[in-house]
A protein has these predicted regions:
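Short aromatic-glycine-enriched beta-strand elements
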Residues: 15, 51-57
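Structural detector for short beta-strands of small beta-barrel domains
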Residues: 3, 7, 37-49
Length: 193
């Protein structure tokens, strides 16, 4: 067999994704019980770390560490996103710069502006995609990045994807107060494959 093939399945109730290249296993990804990168939490500020400008926070999945956490006071609720898997015995690595990623679009609430992947070089294609971005985002204060796979995607699918992510971002941003809670689960192997 020549070419690339993505194989999706389940093993012991967990998602599994495999990449086959020219008939050989190239990559394999098993889902775990650990929180997935991209998970968005409403966390509660716990205690600052002097000298580092960071803060420990409480999440439903355990303690997290937030870098550059200036202006936060203990007990304050904040929205954070998991950036990567935590090392054993360490706090979850978190950021306040939340991104809402999907197949075609990335919505950036804290970074306004409409952008298209640099890998799309065809000017006509870029203009078409920019038109879709303008029509779907309107006067929104949120930013948008259209990913490289938009080059071959259907316009309606791109528009639907942008709307879904913008709606999710708007909904999540209104849920800033309250107890620690998982608001959005990160993508698993099937979605990322």
């Amino acid at each position: 067999m020549k070419g690339r093939l993505i194989v999706l399945d389940h093993h012991k109730g967990q998602q599994v994704a495999a990449l086959m290249v020219d008939g050989r296993l190239d990559d394999l990804w098993f889902d775990t019980d650990a929180p997935r990168p991209g998970t968005i939490y409403r966390a509660i500020a716990d205690r600052p770390v002097k000298g580092m400008g960071g803060m420990f926070v409480k999440t439903p999945d355990g303690p997290g560490f937030l870098r550059h956490a200036k202006g936060l006071s203990p007990g304050q609720s904040i929205l954070v996103q998991l950036t990567s898997y935590a090392e054993p015995g360490k706090a979850l690595p978190l950021t306040q710069k939340i991104l809402f990623k999907s197949r075609f679009a990335i919505v950036t609430p804290d970074a306004p502006g409409l952008n298209i992947s640099r890998s799309i070089r065809d000017e006509e294609q870029r203009e078409l995609l920019m038109g879709i971005a303008h029509s779907e985002m309107g006067e929104s204060n949120m930013g948008l990045i259209l990913r490289s796979c938009c080059a071959t995607a259907d316009r309606a699918d791109i528009a639907d994807d942008i709307n879904a992510m913008a709606d999710l971002a708007t909904q999540i941003l209104t849920e800033q107060t309250g107890a620690a809670e998982t608001l959005v689960e990160g993508d698993g192997p099937h979605a990322l494959a």
